[in-house]
Structure formats: C-alpha cells, structure tokens
Amino acid sequence: MAGNKPLGKKLRLAKALKQNRRVPMFAIARTKGSVKQHPKMRHWRRNTLKK
C-alpha cells in the first residue's frame, strides 16, 4: 500500500488496528478461561476492511 494515504483511510486503518487486539489476561482469568477470544478478531490477510 502506498505511503501517501487519504486521511479517512488512514483513520479507518488505525481504528481497525486498535480494535484488533486480543482479550486481556485479566478477563480470561476472571472468567476462568471461558472467554479466550472475541468474535471480531480480524486477520490481515484473510479478511478485508471496507474501503
């Protein structure tokens, strides 16, 4: 992808990057391991973002 991006696309990519985090360890410990992953995890190569 080009280094020069429109601001809107850059903001969308940044938001997607921040949302794509794992479940925190304290949440896994608090639920005794029943919650290990969240359903909105996105892999960079498999799933695409909206343009």
Curated annotation (Swiss-Prot):
Keywords linked to the UniProt accession: Ribonucleoprotein, Ribosomal protein
Residues forming coiled coils: none
GO molecular function: structural constituent of ribosome
Transmembrane stretches, start-end: none
Compositional bias segments (type: Basic residues): 33-51
One Pfam match: Ribosomal_L39
InterPro entries xrefs: Ribosomal_eL39, Ribosomal_eL39_CS, Ribosomal_eL39_dom_sf
Annotated segments matching region Disordered: 32-51
GO CC, any one term: ribosome
GO BP annotation list: translation
Classification via HAMAP family: Ribosomal_eL39
Family, per entry: Belongs to the eukaryotic ribosomal protein eL39 family.
Protein name: Large ribosomal subunit protein eL39
Gene source species: Methanococcus vannielii (strain ATCC 35089 / DSM 1224 / JCM 13029 / OCM 148 / SB)
The gene coding this protein: rpl39e
